[in-house]
Amino acid sequence: MVITDLVQIRRMGEKNRDENLRFRKYLKTRVWVERQFRHAAEEVHAEIDCRQCAECCRVTEVQLAKRDIEHLAKFLGIREKDFLEQYTMTGVDGELILKRTAAAGCVFLDGNECTVYEARPGNCERFPHLLKGAGSIPSRMWQFVDRATYCPIVYNWMERAKDLTKFRR
C-alpha cells in the first residue's frame, strides 16, 4: 500500500532520515542488480499520479538549461530576454532557476497544476530522477534521502527498496 498523504510523508521521511542515510551507505557497500530497483520505481510511478501532488514544485529550485529557456520562451510566445527577466532568478548556489516564492513555490504552479506542463524544464520532466537520471539508482542515492521527506514516489520507492534488499531497519 502506498502512502500519498504529504503530512505523513514529511513526518515519516524525517523520522526515517537516519535510517535512509544508513540504507544509502548499505547500498554503496554491495553490488546490486539495477533492474530490481528500476522495477520497484516503475511500480511506484504507476501507483502514484505525480500531477496530483506538485509538492516538488513547492519545495525545490528548478535549475534551467539553455534549451529549457528557449523552449519555455517559445511556448509562452515571448523573447528569451523577456523570459529571463520575468520568470527566472538566482538560486542559493548562484545558478539560474525558475522564479519562485516561499509561499507558493514555482512561478508556473497554479494550485497543483503546472501551467507550462507541456514545455516544463528537463529537470521537472525527469523528477524525481528515479527512472530518468545519469548513473545507476544506487549511485544517485544521495538525492533521494531528502526527497523522501516530500515526494511520495521517492518515499514509497525507498521503503520498497529496503524490503527488496532485506535491509535491517
Name these PLM-found stretches.
Residues 1-169:
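Short loop/turn segments that flank or connect secondary-structure elements
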